[in-house]
């Protein structure tokens, strides 16, 4: 029988973390709650009698956090059993080895034990956010976006520095509770608080310095950004959605006024300056999948629809290129599903100037892991009603657009949840990009928390790379994020709206994270491996010593 105490504490921590992450009750989440959400879990680990209890309680914790914070996955085209159910069960088993690792570190004393807890937690969040099953949601940095000074360390450590610091703070609180319960020596707990306090102070001071020395943008890019608030997957509304996007674009170009900053974000930010009347626009930006059918193969459709104002005719009147989401047929690909989820830069004459195909796709939604296996295809068809998926794009692409303010601007276009992946965005940015423009379709989620969670996950990319991030979505959260992670302008959620914004473009900076990428993870893995070897050697020596002692005792008895 499994001990119920660690399971109850795991469930309590899961609920607390789900509330600390942006949710339907507190749209911004709670950074304070995030600094204490893991305390019940940690105390439960300390009170657990066996490794299997710790492992199972951690698996339960991960599964519950996923189910509670990403419950909106159930709305993905009616595939709730597949997208939410299968992933929740999968994460339970995926987390079990890390539960065993947590059980092993409980043998240490307070300061070392707490640091080891934070180290293993960091490795877990990296594993969860990497590879074929990558899904970087439900992580502790999602609770910290309001700590504007602390999160600036992301340009050195990436988001992984926060994956270490936040569990460390939780461990401090938990160790203090454990001290009062067990009446142990207070010196180790004091040392732990001193270490954690120093780390937080140093990181906050660094953050204050980085914000104060941000510098001025080298130019601005006038973007007409359109939020259609329409579901692009609804093929019956294809013509209506296209008409809406065209109308919103023309409204933005005609009025050229910027929206007020929504009151939802709690920080007081400066709204971007808007373009003056009839000022030239450098580029029009629509959202992911705005062109439901592949543009190149369906030009005849876009020449005829919408009937009142065909898309091709509208394009010729723009006077600026259009950045838009559309499926892309991958040339030379003869396999099933040879289409990529793509972003295309269309010139007013209808020519495709540049295109980028999405490389990182949502597991169990945009692609089926191990989908090349016939048995997996049959299972997916039976459970979800589909067995084919998108094909990854050929690789990073750098876009160029002329700027009315002078020269041109280079930018990269991570698609949808690609802006949640630090290494991928760094690979796109280090080609020479001065700006990240993300095109997203989150309308299917039908929840405000899903929109805000995506925004929170993505804002760390702006800090890591010290670049402006523009998120153009079809329902929210459409937002411009500065290199310090602050909101410069935003549209209200689930409203059809548009505006022309002057987006600041900063000089290209190669941050330490951009150069070294996930060095924190490498360091954590080396420490974890070295400590594992040390513990194994120590255990073997201890067993050998015990065996020799027992043998000598037996010999002595015979004598």
From Swiss-Prot:
Broadest EC class assigned to this enzyme: transferase
Membrane topology summary: Multi-pass membrane protein
Coiled-coil residue spans: none
Major localization listed first in the record, in broad terms: membrane
Subcellular location: Cell inner membrane
Enzyme nomenclature, EC number: 2.3.1.269
Active site residues of this protein: 288 (proton acceptor), 358, 416 (nucleophile)
Transmembrane segments: 27-47, 53-73, 86-106, 114-134, 153-173, 187-207, 519-539
GO terms of molecular function: N-acyltransferase activity
UniProt pathway annotation: Protein modification; lipoprotein biosynthesis (N-acyl transfer)
Pfam families with a match to the protein in the record: CN_hydrolase (PF00795), LNT_N (PF20154)
Residues in CN hydrolase domain copies: 221-507
InterPro entries the UniProt entry points to: Apolipo_AcylTrfase, C-N_Hydrolase, C-N_Hydrolase_sf, LNT_N
GO biological process: lipoprotein biosynthetic process
GO cellular component: plasma membrane
The keyword Zinc is annotated on this UniProt entry: no
Keywords, sorted A to Z: Acyltransferase, Cell inner membrane, Cell membrane, Membrane, Transferase, Transmembrane, Transmembrane helix
Function comment: Catalyzes the phospholipid dependent N-acylation of the N-terminal cysteine of apolipoprotein, the last step in lipoprotein maturation.
Family, as annotated: Belongs to the CN hydrolase family. Apolipoprotein N-acyltransferase subfamily.
HAMAP family given in the database record: Lnt
Name of this chain's protein: Apolipoprotein N-acyltransferase 2
Gene: lnt2
